[in-house]
A protein has these predicted regions:
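Auxiliary tRNA-acceptor-end handling modules of aminoacyl-tRNA synthetases
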Residues: 1-44, 62, 66, 77-149, ...
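Conserved catalytic/binding loops enriched for acidic/polar residues
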Residues: 174-343, 347
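Zn2+-dependent metallopeptidase catalytic core
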Residues: 43-71
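The catalytic-center signature of Zn2+-dependent metalloproteases
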Residues: 76-97, 151-207
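Polar, glycine-rich mid-to-C-terminal structural blocks
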Residues: 117-156, 211-247
Length: 348
């Protein structure tokens, strides 16, 4: 709270961020004097390690917008290392196996309260998330070019790393592409949403459409914009104003935890909520129901191999039925609500 202002709302939102200094200050693109280094826990399964590395280092695409090359570096903890993954001297992506995990991961960090400089961070990701990824493969199929397990782990890692470099949730990010556009890689590139900081469901194409990305594997346009605003050195007032002016465009819409529509009576903008997809959730849900119903009918065949258990079948069945329930709830939330235009105070 800014006690030196006479504004009606004196609250100010401040980002915590890492200290990045260019080796070559005049250069448009320069490596930092000290990069942000994240370690991958040596206990990470071998197949998963390169996915986690990519989920870390792909953030360099956003930092290049801010003028930094190789700002984020991923290293794999050596098998013979004598330091613990919980050592605060190392920023580590490590794994937990909780009995009933509430989240697939979380990304806490430690900042200097006087300056806002981040000095340490950890990402804890649940082993249950890896199991979920393998189940995605079993249910939806995969190829080396379009692997839901790989995309899920990259996406999850990106999201948690995003928290540890200063970004909050953005639950408006899914409201960017149309319900058919979101399956078209020529439109979405390597994303499905405007920001990796949303909670997005697996993106499944309906019958008749080619499968696009299951999950985003690069920072979205909002992420690149936010990192540029936060980390670009020596922004002039004019440059800062130009960046802020973009906030009214669809790719830069923002709504975080306090804005997200949830249980009845909590917030009123249906575009800002967890677990939805596309800017026409009614059409997307109708498409998804067809896909889910078809997959439910296929479950007996999918789980007919020797060694498959009734428990595997039942878990997948309830998962698919629950997915239908979540999307019905999202559709119901479209009725009788209001759109909030945070960056457009004169708009009705």
């Amino acid at each position: 709270t800014d006690m030196s202002t006479y504004d009606k709302y004196p609250q100010r939102d401040l980002i915590t961020k890492w200290r990045l200094i260019k080796k070559d200050p005049p250069a448009e693109l320069s490596e930092p004097v000290e990069p942000i280094v994240f370690w991958v826990d040596k206990a990470t399964p071998e197949e998963i390690k390169p996915m986690v590395v990519k989920g870390i280092e792909v953030w360099n695409l956003a930092y290049e917008r801010a003028g930094f090359k190789n700002a984020v570096v991923a290293k794999i903890q050596p098998d013979d290392s004598d330091w613990d993954a919980g050592d605060i001297q190392y920023n580590v992506v490590r794994w937990s196996s909780s009995p009933e995990p509430g989240f697939s991961g979380y990304g806490p960090s430690i900042g200097n309260p006087r300056t806002g400089e981040l000095i340490a961070a950890d990402r804890v990701q649940e082993f249950n998330a890896i199991k979920r990824g393998y189940n995605y493969r079993k249910l939806w199929g995969w190829t080396p070019e379009n692997d839901p397990l790989e995309q899920w782990i990259i996406s999850l890692t990106m999201h948690e790393v995003g928290h540890t470099i200063g970004l909050r949730h953005n639950f408006s990010a899914s409201y960017l592409y149309g319900p058919r556009e979101v399956h078209d890689k020529s439109i979405t590139g390597n994303t499905t949403i405007a920001s990796i900081m949303d909670y997005d469901p697996i993106n499944i194409a309906p019958p008749g459409l080619e499968q696009g990305n299951y999950f985003p594997t690069e920072p979205g346009e909002y992420d690149r914009w936010a990192i540029e605003f936060a980390y670009k050195p020596n922004l002039t007032d004019e440059e800062r104003a130009e960046l802020l002016a973009l906030s009214v465009l669809p790719a830069y819409r923002y709504g975080t935890d306090g804005d997200a529509m949830g249980t009845p009576g909590r917030n009123i903008d249906p575009r800002t909520r967890r677990g939805d997809m596309s800017n026409d959730v009614v059409t997307y849900t109708a498409d998804r129901f067809i896909t889910l119903d078809n997959k439910i009918a296929e479950l007996p065949e999918i789980y007919s191999d020797e060694g498959e258990t009734k428990n595997d079948f039942t878990n997948s069945f309830y998962s698919l039925v629950s997915d239908k329930g979540r999307f019905m709830d999202i559709v119901a939330g479209q009725v009788g609500l209001s759109l909030i235009h945070i960056s457009e105070p004169t708009r009705p």
